[in-house]
Every structure is written in structure tokens, then in C-alpha cells.
Design a protein with these regions (language model features):
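Conserved SAM/AdoMet-binding glycine-rich loop
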Residues: 5-9, 210-214, 347-454, 460-462
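N-terminal [4Fe-4S]-dependent radical SAM core
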Residues: 152-156, 164, 271-313
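Short, electropositive alpha-helical surface patch
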Residues: 377-382, 387, 466-483
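Flexible glycine/acidic-rich beta-alpha junction loops that bind and position SAM and/or redox cofactors
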Residues: 37-49, 220-225, 374, 426, ...
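Structural recognition of alpha->loop->beta junctions
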Residues: 227-250, 408-416, 472-496
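Canonical Radical SAM [4Fe-4S] cluster-binding loop centered on the CxxxCxxC motif
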Residues: 307-344
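Conserved Radical SAM active-site core
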Residues: 43-45, 50, 59-181, 206, ...
């Protein structure tokens, strides 16, 4: 018997396992817990895009097409033809569909177009639900008729047939019968995972009622802290808030007892006498006490990339060392509770992951990498003659010196991601970014001179931002792209995030009112607020305009 089965639910990146479950698994195993893993996300996609399922969907689509002969039939028929090409390709070589991301230029890849059409046709019988594949980013997003931030909608979705409901049930059942765990832990990280996660829990509870089901992860810690819907607990036994390693280990130990004491497990939320109750907080595990992520939990050859192109996630520190940006959820403990490890220990963990997995691309997923720690890692990569490419998120920082950046480049740094947000001094100050335009110019110059490409992130529609200020920022960004100082720029419309300084004190940022969907009780972000400056409609229009203008530069 396995103690615990850890599940990564749909929908997240199909090109690699997310890091949360491997981190949990490594810690639990170091404490003597027997652990099994199920990446339900990739197993779903393998079933959803299998020749057998696509043939079924094609048949359903052709029936539906006859009903739509007078409304868009030409477009649908074009997609059906594309699906038939995909079916031919997959039938000839079943593995080919799961290696489509190996192209170095996905936007020009016919295979990517086939995948996009294949997803579109596979989703057609489930309209209005669908999965949207963005070729330029590789992300697959889930669009549902149900609201992901609403407890009542979650409960409704469980009772309905969805894109995933029939396909995941046999996968879950097979895994549980094989591993025979007494506890299942589901890692809920992204909003697109919410509805499938609760369906997963419902399947487990209906077929294996004696199994203890617990959920944790970034979404749970951010959006379900004050859960008031007791009915949710008919499908789960508990939630774990914030860092889950020590609480989950404690929970497994309690569940082995004849009379478990859930009240003794820290960071836990469970139902007691019909009401959700919270146990006391627990200090997170010191980063130096965490072992290397256990990617051996999953078979890496099941993802839609091969080892040569898989960018495996690796986290160095926890939280953000700046933790003051006004738009960020800085009141959540896993953001504000920053902790960084011994640099040499982290390098040894990195070396272990590379040796055990055989990957040659690493994505350091820290909110903001610490320049000194990255310097040590880069030095050791060179010293040990490790041949990898790596990317990382950085803040604009005076510690990004010419010498450090040249070292990063020599060690294999392939790209640097920078959250810039704005190039207007007033807006930067309101954001409390702790950076100036001079620092931005200085950093971009030395990064460019080192030969490392830059991906920058920008925001449109920050509270009180005017159209002139937004255009001023964009014009500067446009010039940087034109002069090849920035490789890529990603624009997004501003949203008010829960637990951020702006959400907690909106009046300080010129916000007069914030409109939230009354059905959404799980602290959703909001793009609907009233403030001086441009309207929300104008912000959206400008964002689309800027994206289009930058796309024309390719």
C-alpha cells in the first residue's frame, strides 16, 4: 500500500510536469512516506488527443455540421479537413502528436497548427466549453461555461458532463487501484485547474469513499483561505494553506493512527460540526532542508516534448525578495515570507535533477532570482562543465552587473524575463516597484551587451494611468524593440488582485469603487473598477493595439 498519491490535475502546461508535486514528493520521501504520483494533466491530453478519441469527436462534429449547414459550415469543414490530416499523421506514428513542441519556431510550425485544429475539433462536441491553444506561448487555456472563482459554480460543474469528466475517471481509477493509497493530495495551482480538480475529488469520493482527499497549492492558499461553502467538503476532507510540506507529512502521520487528530495538523482547513475550521499556522520548512525535486515521480517521455526541448522547472528560493509591489499579493505568506538557500546546496540539487532526468534546459521559476546566488550557480555550471541552457525571472537591480551577466551568458543563460510594467516615472512610483527609468536603461544596456535576450512584461490600465502615459511607455518600449534591446514584450491589462495593497487600500491608488462578480466568492481578480485616468474599455483597446503593433515588428 502507498501512503499517499499526489495528483497534478488538468489544465496546465502539457510540455512538462509542474514543480509543485515533485517538491512535495521529495520532502515526503525524505521523511519515510511512501509516495506515488499521477500527472492527470498530461494523461488527459494523451487520451483527449488520441486517434481513438479524435475519431469519435470527428463523427460527432460531422453530425453537428449537418445541423449548421447554413451557419459557418465552410469554416467548420475546413477544420474537419485539418483534423483528418491530423488523424492520418497520428495513425501513422502515434508518438508524433506528443512531440510537436520540438520545433524551434513554433509560430511557423505546421505541426502546431495541426495541434490547434485538433484541439478545436476535439472540443467541438463539448461547446460552449473549449481548450484554446496559443501557438506563440505554448499555453493551453480552458474556457468553461462555469465560473472558476465561484463555489456554487464548482458544485454545479461536478454534476455536468465536461471536456474532461469522462476521460479522467478511468485514469484516476486505474491509478488508485494500482497504488492503493489511504490519502490523495491534489495540487491546485492555476485557475484553469479548479473545476477539473473538484471533479477529480468527486470521482475519488464516489468510487473510493474511505480515501482521505486533501487539496493544497497556490490557488487554495490565495483564493480559498476564507472558504464558507460547507458543501464543498462533501468532495474533499481538508485543505492545506500556504507551504504544504510539513503539514502534509503531519497529516499522513495522523491518518495512520486509529483516531487521527486533524486539529493537531497545522495550516489545515476542514469541516467540524458542519463548519469549516482552521488550525494554527506552521512555520514553513527551511529551504535548506528541502531535497532536490523528485521528477522521477513522473515518466518524462509522456510529455509532448522530448528531453532535448523540455524546459524543466527548478525553484531556488521561496517568495519574493522585494515583496513590495502594490499590485502583487504581498500579504500572502508564500509571497512575503521570502527565504533563500545556501547557494552550493542549490547547485548540488540542480546537478542531481540534471543527472537524473537528462534534461538540458532549466527554467528557474523563482519570482525574482537573486543575482549573487545565480552567480554561484553559473560559476559551478562552468566549473563542472555542465552543458545546459537556462532562463530565469529577474528584477531590475543594480546587482545585475556586466561581469555577472557575462558569467550568466557563459554558463548557458538563454533568456532573462523582467517585469517592467511601465516606463512612466509616476506610474512606477505608484506601483512601488523600487526602480527608476535610469536603472531600467542601465540594466537593459548591460544585459544586451552580454548577448542575453530579454523578455519584458508590461501592464496597461494601472489605476489613474492616462492614455498619454500609457502611450509614452509604449513608445519607449517600441523603440527598445526596434533597436533590438528587447527580444519580446508581453502586454496585459491591469487587474486588481486579492490580498494586494491596491485591493486592501484602493482609495490610496485613486480607485473609487471595485466591481466584483457576486457569484464569485473565491476572491477573484477584478478588471472592473472606477478610477481617474483611462476607462477599462480604453485600457483593453490600447493593450490590443500595442500587442498588434509589436507583432507587426516580427
Amino acid at each position: 500500500m502507498t501512503d499517499i498519491l499526489l495528483i497534478q490535475p488538468p489544465f496546465s502546461m502539457p510540455d512538462k510536469p509542474y514543480i509543485s508535486v515533485p517538491v512535495l514528493s521529495a520532502y515526503l520521501k525524505s521523511k519515510g512516506v511512501s509516495v506515488a504520483g499521477l500527472d492527470l494533466n498530461i494523461e488527459f491530453f494523451r487520451e483527449f488527443l488520441s486517434p481513438e478519441h479524435l475519431h469519435v469527436c470527428l463523427g460527432k462534429t460531422e453530425i453537428r455540421l449537418k445541423e449548421l449547414e447554413n451557419s459557418g459550415a465552410d469554416n467548420v469543414q475546413y477544420k474537419i479537413n485539418a483534423l483528418k490530416k491530423l488523424l492520418t499523421s497520428v495513425s501513422d506514428n502515434k508518438a508524433s502528436l506528443f512531440k510537436l513542441f520540438s520545433s524551434s519556431r513554433p509560430s511557423n510550425s505546421h505541426a502546431f497548427q495541426l495541434l490547434k485544429y485538433g484541439l478545436s475539433l476535439a472540443c467541438f462536441p463539448y461547446y460552449p466549453e473549449y481548450l484554446d491553444f496559443t501557438i506563440t506561448t505554448g499555453y493551453i487555456r480552458y474556457h468553461s461555461q462555469f465560473k472558476k472563482f465561484s463555489s456554487s459554480h464548482i458544485l454545479k460543474s461536478i454534476q455536468c458532463e465536461t471536456i474532461y469528466s469522462r476521460l479522467i475517471e478511468p485514469i484516476i481509477s486505474r491509478s488508485i487501484k494500482k497504488e492503493n493509497p489511504f490519502c490523495v493530495g491534489i495540487s491546485l495551482t492555476f485557475p484553469d485547474q479548479v473545476l477539473p480538480t473538484f471533479k477529480c475529488a468527486q470521482i475519488i469520493k464516489s468510487k473510493f469513499p474511505d480515501i482521505f482527499v486533501v487539496m493544497g497549492g497556490a490557488f487554495v492558499s490565495t483564493h480559498m483561505r476564507e472558504i464558507g461553502e460547507a458543501e464543498i467538503f462533501q468532495y474533499i476532507d481538508a485543505l492545506i494553506l500556504d507551504e504544504g510540506e510539513a503539514p502534509l507529512n503531519h497529516l499522513v502521520s495522523e491518518l495512520k493512527k486509529s483516531e487521527p487528530d486533524l486539529g493537531s495538523v497545522p495550516n489545515l482547513c476542514y469541516l467540524d460540526r458542519g463548519r469549516p475550521v482552521h488550525t494554527g499556522q506552521h512555520q514553513p520548512v527551511i529551504v535548506n532542508d528541502l531535497p532536490a525535486p523528485d521528477y522521477g515521480l513522473f515518466s518524462l517521455d509522456r510529455y509532448i516534448v522530448n528531453h532535448e526541448t523540455m524546459a524543466l522547472l527548478f525553484r531556488i528560493s521561496r517568495g519574493c525578495y522585494w515583496k513590495r509591489c502594490s499590485f502583487c499579493r504581498t500579504e500572502i505568506s508564500f509571497i512575503k515570507g521570502h527565504s533563500s538557500p545556501d547557494a552550493e546546496l542549490i547547485f548540488q540539487h540542480l546537478k542531481t535533477v540534471i543527472e537524473e532526468t537528462g534534461v538540458s534546459i532549466i527554467h528557474f521559476s523563482d519570482d525574482a532570482a537573486i543575482p549573487e546566488i545565480m552567480e554561484h550557480i553559473a560559476t559551478q555550471i562552468i566549473k563542472n562543465k555542465i552543458s545546459i541552457k537556462w532562463v530565469a525571472n529577474f528584477r531590475f537591480d543594480n546587482r545585475l552587473t556586466t561581469d555577472r551577466l557575462r558569467l550568466y551568458k557563459e554558463s548557458g543563460c538563454h533568456s532573462i524575463y523582467l517585469g517592467l510594467e511601465s516606463l512612466n516615472p509616476r506610474i512606477l512610483k505608484l506601483m512601488n516597484k523600487g526602480i527608476t527609468e535610469d536603472l531600467v536603461t542601465k540594466n537593459i544596456k548591460v544585459i544586451k551587451e552580454s548577448g542575453i535576450p530579454i523578455v519584458a512584461y508590461m501592464i496597461v490600465g494601472f489605476p489613474t494611468e492616462t492614455e498619454d502615459e500609457a502611450r509614452e511607455s509604449f513608445n519607449k518600449m517600441y523603440e527598445m524593440r526596434k533597436n533590438n534591446l528587447i527580444k519580446k514584450c508581453v502586454y496585459n491589462v491591469f487587474e486588481v488582485a486579492s490580498s494586494s495593497p491596491i485591493a486592501l487600500s484602493p482609495e490610496k491608488y485613486g480607485i473609487k469603487s471595485i466591481a466584483y462578480d457576486q457569484e464569485c466568492d473565491l476572491l477573484p481578480p477584478s478588471s472592473k473598477f472606477e478610477a481617474d485616468g483611462m476607462s477599462r474599455e480604453k485600457a483593453t483597446a490600447l493593450c490590443n493595439e500595442f500587442i498588434h503593433a509589436l507583432d507587426q515588428m516580427k
